Every structure is written in C-alpha cells, then in structure tokens.
C-alpha cells in the first residue's frame, strides 16, 4: 500500500485553485485518492469562514452605529495585520478539537465565535473588541449572525465526530505580502509567519502543497470567480483589489523553498523555552509545487457532468506529480 499523507497544508495566493483542488479530490473514489495521490479520505479545515464572519460582525456593528472592529471597511484590509496570525490560532484550535473528536455544545454559536475571536486576538497581543460590547448590543449582533455561525459550528462538530483512522487532513490558507515587497517578508505577512504560528502538532505531521500561479493571474481569477452574493462561498468569494495588491501582491513560498538547507522542503526555525532557557526547534516540511500557471483548475467550478476528459486528465496528472513528490 502506498504511503498515506497525514496532513496537507494547501497554500497559495487567492483564486489560485486551492478550493477547486479540494473539490476535485472530493469527486474521486477512495481508491483513486490512495493510489494516485497518497491520500486517505479527506478532512478539511479552512480559515476563510472566519474572514467572512469577521466581515459580518463588522457589518452588524456598523448597522448599530459603531465603528468596524476588524477591517478598515467592507472592502478594505484588516485594521491590524496581526489578524493574519489570529486566523492561524483559530485553525490551531479547530485542529485540536478535531484530533480530540471534541463536540462543542453551546447555547449560542455566535456568542461562542465572539469569545473565540477575542481569545485568539489575545494570544497574538491584540485587543478583544467583542468583550467590550455592551451586553444588549452584543445580544443583537449575535442574534443576527446566529444562523451562519451555527452552520459553521455544526459542520465542524460533524467532522470532529468522524473516525480519523486512515484519513488525510487538508488545511487551506492564503498568505502573501504587498506588491513589490522584498524578501524576507516582514511579519506578520507571508507564509513564514504562518509557519511560526501553526501548532507544533501540525508541523510535525504536515507537508505543503503549494498551488503556483503568478500574482497577476491570481488577481484576474479573483475577479472572474467573484459573485456579488458569493462572499460566504469558498468557491465564489472575491477579495477586494486593495487587499489583493497590498496583502497578496506577492508571496514568499518560492523564497522559503530557496532558503531551505534541504531540497524539497521548507525549513522552519521555532524558538522554544524549556527549563528556563531558550532553544531552537527546526522543522523540515516536505513541499511540492502544483504548477497551475496554465489554469488547470477553473473548470472544476462547473457542474461535474460538464468536465471534459482532457481537462480532467491534465489536472489529475499535475496533482499526481506533486503528491508523488510529497510522498517521497
């Protein structure tokens, strides 16, 4: 039997094809995934739902006469760039709950999300705006978001309850830096900060599948995929252009690969403390590029019945080469 990959960090710029890759994998039989891609049946974690729900919280705060808590505006970047690290802390928590098969049972999913957001902000040294809301206003905001938050929490709970034996976890995220930035990117931008924030439990089990597209192509596809009513959708949301240029104008994955002392890996140095002393822990995560500069993935957004065999074959072959590299 081929080696089953434990955890895949599915990373790339927005609209590069990450979600389409996930959808394509979901269309395959377990035998195809195992034999061609070294994958067990997949479990999925993604930080985009939190990006969307923070926008929704800001919408409700504005509707009640308050300022935005998380963003400079509905189509603008985060108020504090360290919110990128907040998203990783939320993924760390989701991962811990998944591995523990934990069922999160709360009276209000929206109130629970507010508490989680504040706790994650505190971990990276940011203010906790939801805790400062007047009680009656917080109840109104929670009521407006309860249905959306409940859907997300229920989905996580359903996944947490599943048997993890022989499964592959796929964690999806996009990171980058401003157009024209020099490397290394300054924290908290880029994948370097994401790797510095991810739980060691994840790093010890993970490999990186990097979906490679040019930033200009990422911007084009971002506009192409967007739908005005699709901001809550993984496949059809669109990132504002200010964010695309200011936060995703480049990324540092290629640079990190070049800096590694082991070919085919990214090297991550983490400072740890033990016995009242600091030391360095080094991780070498296997990494493979799936070259999507020729756009092998857009067709996956359409109905599966419309997929053309030649397009499927090209996508399958490209992914197989990348996963074979990760499996060694």
Regions found by a protein language model. Give the residues of each.
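Glycine-rich phosphate-binding loop of ATP-dependent small-molecule kinases
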Residues: 1-328
């Amino acid at each position: 039997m081929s080696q089953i990959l434990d955890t895949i960090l599915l990373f790339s710029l927005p609209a590069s094809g990450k979600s389409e890759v996930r959808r394509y994998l979901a269309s395959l039989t377990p035998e195809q995934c195992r034999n061609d891609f070294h994958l067990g049946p997949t479990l999925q974690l993604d930080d985009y739902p939190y990006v969307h729900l923070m926008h929704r919280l800001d919408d409700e705060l504005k509707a009640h006469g308050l300022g935005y808590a998380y963003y400079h505006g509905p189509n603008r970047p985060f108020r504090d760039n360290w919110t990128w690290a907040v998203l990783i802390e939320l993924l760390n928590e989701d991962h811990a709950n998944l591995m523990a098969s934990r069922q999160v049972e709360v009276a209000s999913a929206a109130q629970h999300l507010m508490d989680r957001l504040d706790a994650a902000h505190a971990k990276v040294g940011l203010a906790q705006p939801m805790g400062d809301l007047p009680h009656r206003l917080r109840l109104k905001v929670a009521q407006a978001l309860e249905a959306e938050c409940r859907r997300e929490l229920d989905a996580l709970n359903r996944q947490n309850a599943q048997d993890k034996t022989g499964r592959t976890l796929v964690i999806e995220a996009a990171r980058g830096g401003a157009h024209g930035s020099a490397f290394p990117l300054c924290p908290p931008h880029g994948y370097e900060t994401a790797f510095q924030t991810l739980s060691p439990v994840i790093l010890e089990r993970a490999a990186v599948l990097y979906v490679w597209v040019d930033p200009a192509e990422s911007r084009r596809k971002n506009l192409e995929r967007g739908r005005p009513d699709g901001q809550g959708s993984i496949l059809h949301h669109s990132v504002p252009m200010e964010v695309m240029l200011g936060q995703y104008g480049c990324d540092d994955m290629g640079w990190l690969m070049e800096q590694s002392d082991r070919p085919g890996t990214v090297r991550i140095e983490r400072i740890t403390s033990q016995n009242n002393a600091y030391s360095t822990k080094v991780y070498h995560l296997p990494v493979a590029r799936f070259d999507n500069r020729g756009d092998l993935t857009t067709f996956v957004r359409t109905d599966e019945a419309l997929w053309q065999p030649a397009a499927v074959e090209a996508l399958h072959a490209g992914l197989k080469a990348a996963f074979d590299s990760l499996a060694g």
